[in-house]
């Protein structure tokens, strides 16, 4: 039971010993999610493109995935893709499916940018993001769950229960 800033834990009596209670300091709350707002630019055939407000979300409970939420119009649109895909796309073209990421060398402002290509049955979109925003997001996500340690954050019992239910 949490009491103040410590846990009180009742211990069962062991033969020859009395019932005791032990105070254990409460662990500080550990952040398990990363959210970063990013300004994207939707590429168009003419002009500088259209601004698209978005956010990137990463959670330790889904350690392989990034959730990109694009805000605009009447509803938000969410795409989920691999964190490794975003990381690999910073230095070379990555992805062969609905989401592709690559460095952007033809940005009108000349700043390092990342191109995100999204394809669905409803249409395609090319979005540019500042490389610095993407790197900042990945640094924070990697600090939360270092690359290669994702399996330590998976609840396999819960996953199996969802698969069989």
Curated annotation (Swiss-Prot):
Record's subcellular location: Cell septum
Membrane listed as a keyword: no
Chain residue ranges for the region called Disordered: 1-21
Function: Involved in sporulation-specific cell division. Required for early stages of sporulation. Important in the process of growth cessation prior to sporulation-specific cell division. Recruits cell division protein FtsZ to the future septum sites and tethers the contractile ring structure (Z ring) to the cytoplasmic membrane during sporulation. Stimulates polymerization and filament length of FtsZ in vitro.
InterPro entries per record: SsgB, SsgB_sf
Record key words, sorted: Cell cycle, Cell division, Septation, Sporulation
Cystines in this chain: none
GO cellular component, one term: cell septum
Superkingdom classification of source: Bacteria
One Pfam family linked to the record: SsgA
Subunit structure: Interacts with SsgA. Interacts with FtsZ (via N-terminus).
Segments forming a coiled coil: none
UniProt similarity note: Belongs to the SsgA family.
Name under which the protein is recorded: Sporulation-specific cell division protein SsgB
Gene: ssgB
Lineage, uppermost ranks: Bacteria, Bacillati, Actinomycetota, Actinomycetes, Kineosporiales
Gene Ontology biological process terms in this record: division septum assembly; sporulation resulting in formation of a cellular spore
The UniProt record lists the keyword Cell division: yes
């Amino acid at each position: 039971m949490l009491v103040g800033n410590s846990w009180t834990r009742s211990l069962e009596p062991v033969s020859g010993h009395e019932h005791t209670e032990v105070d254990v300091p409460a662990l500080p709350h550990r952040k398990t999610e990363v959210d970063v707002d990013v300004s994207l630019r939707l590429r168009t055939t003419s002009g500088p493109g259209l601004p698209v407000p978005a956010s990137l979300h990463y959670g330790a409970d889904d350690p392989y995935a990034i959730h990109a939420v694009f805000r605009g119009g009447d509803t938000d649109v969410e795409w989920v893709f691999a964190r490794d895909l975003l990381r690999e796309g910073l230095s070379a073209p990555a992805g062969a499916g609905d989401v592709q990421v690559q460095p952007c060398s033809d940005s009108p402002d000349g700043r390092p940018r990342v191109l995100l290509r999204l394809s669905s049955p409803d249409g395609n979109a090319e979005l540019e993001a500042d490389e610095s925003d993407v790197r900042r997001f990945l640094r924070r996500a990697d600090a939360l769950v270092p690359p290669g340690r994702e399996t330590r954050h998976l609840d396999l019992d819960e996953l199996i229960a969802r698969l069989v239910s």
